[in-house]
């Protein structure tokens, strides 16, 4: 098997690259120096090196070393070992976690550890090896760059520096189909990095995407949930959505939604999901919070809405119909992309409030204002109005109602604000003198 990786790496000295320790997390540097002082090799690796070379601020700093996880734990009291598929060491510094991975091996006789492969997919990879073998085990060339704390050089085995310069995303190795089969999540990572970095996928890596989406069904639903968050909560969610659909991957993550989107409604394309993801991207760019509950409410709304309409047509009451539709869609989705309860329950509450937002008379609007999911449900209603799904008048009414004073709210909910005359309590008549006398 011929792999596109060099036995003799390109080593770029400190004077010829742009990475400065001033831009590296202080805690990551502590880990690197402690490993070096312990007699181990220590490298900053992966997306952190890539982003530093691109002039971006890394989100995470990962470390690679020849120390085993157990040896790492002996060096750091604040270390915790995690993972079954990939054994990793997490070194905790308050809220920051530095992930430390032992060099992965290629499977030669002198490597240490174990690897299990089922149907071509690596289900456990705790086989340890050399730095060169570790580079071979990585996914993309731009993620196989090593920053050496010993001499501050950058080590490149796979042509990642040239690909960074060219804006090209390329899988390591000469068999992209096999690399995707080893770990199907690499297909989602290919889409995510292409969107995040603005890079073009190398054609040999792009072609298999169109035929390999079914492999995602072999990935644990909980892991796919985490990958979906990375795809859609990184600021390029709309672009990721469009690429996932282009490569036929979205249908394997959200088949019910894809089925709805593939059919136009009254000769108009359904735009709600696109508008929702565009709104999410904008909020992230403005440093505003976004929640997984709202994101998944957007991604699964079309099948919920369709089933809701069917149930209402069967004479179900709107609130009941929405609860039934929500439950059906969520239960079908759960085996594919598992949504934790802490997000699944508020997601369903956002949906459940939609028919209740149609009720604008009496005390109901006041009660809705105090509901813990009202704001999210209101924002969801605004998106529906933008997509032409509901009348803009309804969304505007709720906007005005929130801003109105007491009398204005009364006028909006009581048709003119006329106060009812309070009913008088009937006074019990006292016994007459005659009756009193007769009682004796």
Where are these regions (language model features)?
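Catalytic cores of the polymerase beta-like nucleotidyltransferase superfamily
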Residues: 1-440
């Amino acid at each position: 098997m011929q792999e596109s990786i060099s036995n003799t790496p390109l080593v770029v000295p400190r004077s010829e690259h742009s990475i400065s320790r001033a831009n590296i997390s202080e805690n990551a540097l502590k880990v690197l120096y402690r490993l070096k002082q312990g007699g181990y090799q220590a490298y900053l690796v992966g997306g952190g090196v890539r982003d530093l070379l691109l002039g971006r601020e890394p989100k995470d700093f990962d470390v690679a070393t020849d120390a085993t996880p157990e040896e790492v734990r002996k060096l750091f009291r604040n270390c915790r070992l995690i993972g079954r598929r990939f054994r990793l060491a997490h070194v905790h510094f308050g809220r920051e976690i530095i992930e430390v991975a032992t060099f992965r091996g290629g499977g030669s006789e002198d490597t240490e550890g174990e690897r299990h492969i089922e149907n071509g997919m690596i289900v456990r990879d705790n086989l340890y090896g050399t730095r060169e073998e570790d580079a071979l085990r990585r996914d993309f060339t731009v993620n196989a760059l090593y920053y050496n704390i010993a001499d501050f050089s950058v080590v490149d085995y796979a042509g990642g520096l040239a690909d960074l310069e060219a804006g090209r995303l390329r899988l390591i190795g000469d068999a992209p189909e096999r690399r995707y089969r080893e770990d199907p999540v690499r297909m989602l990572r290919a889409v995510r990095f292409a969107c995040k970095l603005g890079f073009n996928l190398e054609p040999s890596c792009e072609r298999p995407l169109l035929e390999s989406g079914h492999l995602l069904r072999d990935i644990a639903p909980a892991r796919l949930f985490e990958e979906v968050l990375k795809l859609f909560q990184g600021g390029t969610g709309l672009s990721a959505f469009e690429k996932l659909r282009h490569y036929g991957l979205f249908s394997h993550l959200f088949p019910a939604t894809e089925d709805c989107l593939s059919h136009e409604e009254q000769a108009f394309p359904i735009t709600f999901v696109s508008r929702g993801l565009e709104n999410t991207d904008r909020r992230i760019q403005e440093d505003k919070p976004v929640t997984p509950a709202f994101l998944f409410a957007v991604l699964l709304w079309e099948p919920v809405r369709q089933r809701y309409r069917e149930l209402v047509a069967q004479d179900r009451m709107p609130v009941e119909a929405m609860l039934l539709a929500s439950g059906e869609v969520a239960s079908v989705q759960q085996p594919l992309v598992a949504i934790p309860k802490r997000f699944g329950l508020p997601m369903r509450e956002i949906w459940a409030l939609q028919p209740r937002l149609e009720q604008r008379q009496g005390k109901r609007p006041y009660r809705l204002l105090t509901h813990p999911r009202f704001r999210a449900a209101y924002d969801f209603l605004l998106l529906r109005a933008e997509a032409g799904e509901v009348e803009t008048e309804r969304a505007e009414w709720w906007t005005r109602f929130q801003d109105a004073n007491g009398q204005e709210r009364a006028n909006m909910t009581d048709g003119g604000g006329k106060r009812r005359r309070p009913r008088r309590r009937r006074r019990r008549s006292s016994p007459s003198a005659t009756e009193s006398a007769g009682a004796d």
